[in-house]
């Protein structure tokens, strides 16, 4: 059977223990199995080891290979590629993110279905806005901690109509306005050519 | 006593308008831009300064730059060699951002299109090549768990470091050009998003321009481009609100945010 990865990232600065717990809860692990996932990889953050260890112990054996790590200085690219899969051997899986813009962008660029779960305990919660706006445009699935199994289902739907990032320019009239970063820097530099 | 107070008051009243006038002069985006003759003219070496923050800020900055230098559309493709010298500013202890900057430089500098190669043949004499980059560390404006009380002290330390790094490269000028070909001058452009370090560095650049240190204001140096975080959909960030009337360009990445009529806000499409 081909393997299929679910990669979970809780972010580097403010660890999101509730997400670690939620993806190791029995209902979610069952949902993973139901969607023929074989592997669950969790980046649990600086102080998340304890939460991770106890949740893994509580989950017991369940047919899913669970692995975790604190943080990877080399970036998450490796894990994203793993989740993207490579055709026959490894099927395309899913990324579950704490709604940090870096991981969302990585997944969108690589066109891996992504479930975005904002941390509602953070004070300045603009990440919810990002999750909502992106879910509305059907770039991501907006997931809730209470029902991640449902989000996994939605991710399968998203897989079928994954949109590409950066968004393609539509219409000629818009191109005049969208000059990209280069256009803006050129204007400021005053290059004559 | 009353006499001294009145004199002080009068002096303030007299000098305040002058100071404010000076501020409006240097803060208007229509302040003069230098005339440039070609993108890679050895007499006008360009200097780009990029500020990285931790986590999301660094990720977004590099996503935006990577998208620009790898764009398939030639009109939008940023040629990294157009910027002869690049200064990357990172906060103390943020080795991850330093690593990312290095990776980006190694990826972006060798990128060259056929067009560049052709141009190289014709314009070799006036092309100063890929130039170089440096990564500069400044003390943090505020540690994550630092009490607010000591924040002014650490912010001041950060400000002093920013001033030093902005002054690191300056040149004597001749007819508005660097006196020596290829010599690195003040940054021409400061590119940033929302970390606290960015706010302080922009403030440092405003101070230098206020006093026209080494002619930086007259020569139109240190124009500032601020890109609001892509994660800001409905409300501006604190840095954004602070800088919206100070930077030359203030870009947001969601059209609904541009409707907030704040400062120099503009929406030119998503940039990350």
Task: Identify the function of each model-found stretch.
Chain B
Residues 1-29:
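Terminal signal-anchor or tail-anchor transmembrane helices
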Residues 14, 51-52, 56-84, 92-93, ...:
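Active-site and donor-binding regions of nucleotide-sugar-utilizing enzymes
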Residues 26-50, 59:
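N-terminal signal-anchor transmembrane helix
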Residues 98:
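Phosphate-coordination/substrate-recognition cap region in phosphate-metabolizing enzymes
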């Amino acid at each position: 059977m081909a393997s299929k990865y679910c990669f979970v990232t809780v972010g580097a600065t403010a660890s999101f223990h509730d997400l670690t717990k939620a993806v190791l809860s029995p209902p979610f692990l069952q949902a993973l199995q139901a969607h023929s996932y074989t592997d669950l990889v969790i980046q649990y953050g600086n102080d998340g080891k304890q939460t991770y260890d106890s949740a893994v112990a509580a989950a017991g054996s369940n047919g899913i290979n669970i692995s975790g790590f604190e943080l990877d200085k080399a970036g998450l690219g490796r894990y994203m590629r793993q989740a993207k899969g490579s055709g026959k051997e490894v099927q395309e899986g899913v990324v579950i993110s704490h709604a940090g813009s870096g991981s969302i962008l990585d997944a969108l660029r690589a066109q891996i279905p992504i479930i975005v779960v904002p941390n509602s305990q953070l004070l300045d919660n603009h990440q919810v806005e990002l999750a909502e706006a992106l879910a509305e445009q059907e770039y991501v699935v907006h997931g809730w901690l209470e029902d991640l199994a449902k989000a996994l289902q939605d991710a399968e739907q998203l897989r079928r109509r994954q949109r590409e990032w950066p968004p393609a320019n539509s219409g000629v009239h818009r191109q005049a306005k969208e000059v990209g970063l280069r256009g803006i820097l050129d204007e400021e530099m005053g290059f004559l050519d | 006593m009353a006499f001294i107070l009145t004199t002080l008051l009068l002096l303030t009243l007299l000098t305040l308008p002058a100071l404010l006038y000076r501020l409006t002069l240097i803060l208007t985006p229509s302040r003069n831009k230098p005339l440039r003759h070609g993108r890679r003219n050895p007499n006008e070496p360009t200097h780009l300064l990029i500020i990285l923050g931790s986590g999301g800020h660094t990720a977004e900055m590099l996503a935006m730059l990577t998208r620009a230098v790898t764009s398939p559309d030639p009109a939008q493709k940023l040629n990294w060699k157009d910027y002869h010298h690049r200064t990357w500013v990172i906060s103390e202890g943020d080795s991850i951002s330093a690593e990312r900057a290095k990776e980006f430089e190694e990826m972006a500098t060798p990128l060259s299109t056929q067009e560049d190669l052709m141009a190289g043949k014709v314009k070799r004499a006036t092309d100063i090549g890929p130039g170089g980059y440096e990564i500069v560390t400044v003390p943090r404006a505020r540690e994550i768990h630092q009490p607010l009380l000591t924040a002014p002290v650490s912010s001041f330390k950060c400000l002093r470091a920013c001033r030093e790094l902005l002054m690191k490269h300056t040149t004597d000028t001749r007819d508005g050009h660097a006196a020596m070909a290829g010599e690195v001058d003040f940054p021409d452009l400061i590119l940033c998003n929302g970390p606290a370090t960015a706010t302080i560095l922009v403030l440092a650049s405003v101070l230098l321009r206020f006093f026209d240190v080494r002619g930086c204001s007259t020569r139109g140096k240190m124009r500032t481009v601020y890109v609001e975080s892509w994660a800001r959909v409905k409300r501006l960030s604190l840095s954004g609100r602070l800088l919206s009337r100070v930077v030359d360009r203030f870009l947001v990445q969601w059209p609904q945010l541009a409707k907030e009529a704040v400062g120099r806000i503009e929406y030119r499409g998503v940039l990350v």
